[in-house]
């Protein structure tokens, strides 16, 4: 496939000669100091923002496979968007083992057409943010498909527009991010990431962010308690890195400030927020034109 005049490549195959202003390619994660006040804030927020773990059920079970791709789909009323269908079709056509975690108000609202796309399908209730879906998926895989490599992403992105099937297996890291930032602290951005060899021990090491007994129900808490801490917690027991890193002193968010350059470099996603709360970062008409050029139905 060709994107913007270049051949689209899996992220693990992007040539090291690619240069994007303000971004570092193939970045190894390292912890930065955590001030005492932030540690206190983390504890206080966990107590203040915790909610019960979401209700869930297995619709189509996980079975033993070498690798899984997890797609978290939020559809409270059970209606799939054109963007959802585009993503699901790309995953089906790529031949991956796809686990869909679908959030609706009740199990009966899970769209029946998901069965045609998903090798495994879980329903999740409205409680909890996206990390509660990740937790559910990873726990099921650790039990039913122990040792599998797992790529996870959510529906905050358009795409994928290039091959993501080997992003985890060919990565040099155990925990792989697509992009990383130093906003708040060095962290992997959680819209998409991969974990090698997911098993019970791995989940135990990651329990400080993939909460086994509760969830959080708002964006700020999910960012501060889970996204920002995920790479730090993971680095205690595994190698961690990202394909692209942006220092917050140079740019706020790689996916918002350099989206078109990333796409030209073979990056598989565009953030949906470029047409929403982050629309001030890029011209919306250009975003739509790029999506149209990529064959996306919007």
Q: What does each model-found stretch correspond to?
A:
Residues 2-298:
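ER/Golgi luminal nucleotide-sugar-dependent glycosyltransferases, focusing on the catalytic module
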């Amino acid at each position: 496939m060709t994107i913007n005049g270049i051949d689209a490549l899996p992220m693990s195959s992007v040539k090291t000669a690619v240069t994007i202003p303000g971004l570092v390619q193939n970045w190894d994660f390292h912890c930065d100091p955590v001030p005492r006040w932030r540690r206190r804030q983390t504890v206080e927020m966990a107590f203040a923002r915790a909610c019960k773990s979401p209700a869930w059920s297995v619709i189509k079970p996980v079975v033993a496979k070498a690798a899984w791709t997890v797609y978290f789909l939020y559809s409270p009323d059970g209606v799939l968007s054109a963007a959802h269908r585009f993503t699901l079709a790309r995953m089906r056509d790529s031949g991956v083992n796809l686990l869909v975690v679908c959030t609706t108000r009740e199990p009966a609202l899970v769209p029946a057409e998901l069965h045609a796309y998903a090798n495994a399908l879980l329903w999740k209730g409205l409680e909890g943010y996206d990390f509660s879906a990740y937790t559910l998926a990873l726990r099921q895989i650790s039990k039913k498909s122990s040792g599998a490599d797992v790529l996870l992403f959510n529906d905050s992105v358009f795409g994928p527009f290039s091959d993501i099937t080997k992003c985890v297996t060919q990565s040099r890291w155990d925990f792989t991010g697509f992009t990383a930032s130093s906003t708040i602290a060095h962290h992997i951005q959680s819209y998409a990431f991969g974990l090698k060899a997911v098993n019970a021990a791995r989940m135990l090491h990651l329990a400080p962010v993939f909460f086994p007994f509760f969830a959080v129900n708002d964006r700020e808490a999910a960012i501060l308690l889970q996204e920002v801490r995920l790479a730090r917690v993971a680095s205690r027991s595994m190698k961690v890195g990202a394909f692209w890193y942006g220092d917050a002193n140079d740019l706020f968010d790689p996916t918002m400030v350099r989206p078109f350059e990333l796409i030209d470099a073979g990056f598989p996603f565009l953030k949906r927020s470029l047409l929403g709360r982050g629309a001030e970062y890029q011209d919306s008409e250009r975003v739509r034109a790029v999506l149209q050029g990529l064959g996306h139905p919007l």
